[in-house]
């Protein structure tokens, strides 16, 4: 991964990411590097340009730890993991969920508190459902959010390497 401080890169929490193909297309259009981070091997299409695969081993949070460690201003982190989103925001990264939700410093506290409350209720047997199924509108919202994040970073002085 190019680690120049003024360049844009995309870091993907890839194990269960449903929008990897969209990330590859957007990154190619903007000539941006992508780092796919996973706990196991993830196939990358041959035509995907500038995509690096990082397979971490060890504990369940190893991929999250790697992404948090490499998060920085100019990085766009794609994750559905709320605690990882919080850690990446602390490092100055832009964070987008696969459903297109943009996490910010001003919203992540409430999102994290809600997640923790639902986890507690689920542990107590009060909540049995999970998130809504991934839908085409989520894919569209994600593409818009990713393009917006890249445009904002370019306007802020970051560039493709």
Curated annotation (Swiss-Prot):
Family as reported in the entry's similarity comment: Belongs to the UPF0178 family.
Record-linked Pfam families: DUF188
HAMAP family cross-referenced by the UniProt entry: UPF0178
Domain of life: Bacteria
Taxonomy of the source species: Bacteria, Pseudomonadati, Pseudomonadota, Alphaproteobacteria, Hyphomicrobiales
The protein's name in its UniProt record: UPF0178 protein BCAN_A2024
